[in-house]
Amino acid sequence: MKTTSLKPADVDKKWVVIDAEGLVVGRLASIVAMRLRGKHKPAYTPHVDCGDHVIVINADKVKFTGRKYDQKVYYHHTGYPGGIKERSAKFILEGRFPERVVEKAVERMLPRGPLFRQILGHLRVYKGAAHPHEAQQPQALDVGSLNRKNVSA
């Protein structure tokens, strides 16, 4: 039996839309990261971008388990000495760009490198239910029905 190795020209990329309303952030992010890399396909090749385009809508309505909504802290550095800044998940989700919570969760589940930057370009996250990708005819993926723990009670 021969091992198949995909060429970039042979990859069939689909468009998938996921409604994040009521879903647990980490579980959603792991499924999205798997789809972006293409690990759900039988002909997965690690050095080829063989994943799908993923659209996440209602990113502002994701859930955290436990007390992470209040206690989880996101750090960034300004570049100046002593310039470490922190924000809570609650502050970000109630702020201007709540989709960044999902973007960061997915980004941190992907391996770094040139392929990482290419793969991350196939992720689109929107805070509302509307998205401008209807022309691509994305297929809906119900993440909540895959496992009962994916949905926060």
From Swiss-Prot:
Transmembrane stretches in the record are: none
- Which family would the database say this protein is a member of? Belongs to the universal ribosomal protein uL13 family.
**Looking at the record, which segments are called Disordered?**
134-153
Q: Which NCBIfam families match?
A: rplM_bact (TIGR01066)
Name of one Pfam family that matches? Ribosomal_L13
Its BP terms in the Gene Ontology are:
negative regulation of translation; translation
Matching entries from PANTHER family are given as: LARGE RIBOSOMAL SUBUNIT PROTEIN UL13M (PTHR11545:SF2), RIBOSOMAL PROTEIN L13 (PTHR11545)
The organism's place on the tree of life at top rank = Bacteria
Molecular-function annotations in GO: mRNA binding; structural constituent of ribosome
**What's the source species for this entry?**
Methylorubrum extorquens (strain PA1)
Entry's Gene3D superfamilies?
Ribosomal protein L13
| HAMAP family, per database record | Ribosomal_uL13
Give the keywords, sorted: Ribonucleoprotein, Ribosomal protein
Q: State whether it acts alone or in a complex, and with which partners, per the record.
A: Part of the 50S ribosomal subunit.
Question: What is the official name of this protein in its record?
Answer: Large ribosomal subunit protein uL13
Q: Enumerate the InterPro entries for this protein.
A: Ribosomal_uL13, Ribosomal_uL13_bac-type, Ribosomal_uL13_sf
Q: Name one GO cellular component term.
A: cytosolic large ribosomal subunit
Question: What role is this protein assigned?
Answer: This protein is one of the early assembly proteins of the 50S ribosomal subunit, although it is not seen to bind rRNA by itself. It is important during the early stages of 50S assembly.
